[in-house]
């Protein structure tokens, strides 16, 4: 798997534009989809610029987009918004095929040790049999903390589509991972 984070976000030492936008969208505007989508558009443009620089449209190694299953308590899901907006006839959003098969508390409140115990085995890929196996998958996430969610999503993909190249992009990662828990 190849992976990138567009930004480094740190709680005690400073905030970044991307980190602040994610925070506002996820925790203040999550139940106001119209306002959240306006803010999310900024993140979408940043992500598009990154992807075009890294993978020119004519040479994209993936034809599938996915994001880990979201917290269903929100009315607006940032990663779903991004995957839907990035999808096209040649790059399909197949996120609905990656499902949570075991519930656990919100990842944000779990310690690193709890994540290692609770996240593995919590996702399953149930492929749409009417669609071909993708030649490559771009996994999109909003915040990378311990990496356990990304690992679990990749594990679920590997079970069904072994050897399929995976590319992971997170909008931001926490520089102070694990120190606040």
Identify the role of each PLM range.
Residues 104-181:
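PRPP/pyrophosphate-binding module of the type I phosphoribosyltransferase fold
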Residues 28-29, 72-73, 144-147:
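Short acidic, S/G/P-rich loop/turn micro-motifs used as interaction or catalytic elements
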Residues 59-70, 137:
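Short glycine-rich phosphate-binding loop at a beta-alpha junction
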Residues 79-95:
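Glycine-rich phosphate-binding loop and adjoining helix at the ATP-binding site
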Residues 66-70, 93-106:
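A short, structured active-site edge motif that brings together acidic residues
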Residues 69-79:
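Glycine-rich phosphate-binding loops at beta-strand->alpha-helix junctions
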Residues 1-61, 100-133, 176:
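Active-site-facing substrate-recognition patch
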């Amino acid at each position: 798997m190849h992976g990138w984070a567009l930004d480094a976000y740190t709680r005690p030492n400073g905030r970044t534009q991307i980190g602040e936008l994610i925070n506002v969208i996820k925790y203040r505007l999550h139940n106001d989809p119209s306002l959240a989508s306006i803010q999310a558009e900024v993140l979408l443009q940043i992500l598009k610029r990154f992807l075009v620089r890294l993978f020119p449209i004519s040479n994209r190694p993936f034809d599938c987009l996915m994001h880990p299953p979201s917290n269903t308590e929100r009315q607006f899901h940032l990663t779903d918004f991004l995957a839907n907006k990035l999808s096209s006839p040649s790059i399909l959003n197949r996120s609905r095929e990656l499902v949570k098969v075991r519930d656990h508390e919100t990842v944000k409140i779990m310690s690193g040790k709890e994540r290692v115990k609770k996240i593995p085995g919590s996702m399953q890929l149930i492929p749409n049999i009417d669609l071909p196996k993708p030649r490559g998958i771009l996994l999109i996430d909003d915040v990378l903390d311990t990496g356990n969610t990304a690992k679990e999503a990749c594990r679920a993909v590997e079970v069904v589509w072994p050897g399929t190249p995976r590319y992971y992009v997170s909008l931001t990662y926490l520089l102070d991972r694990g120190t606040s828990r």
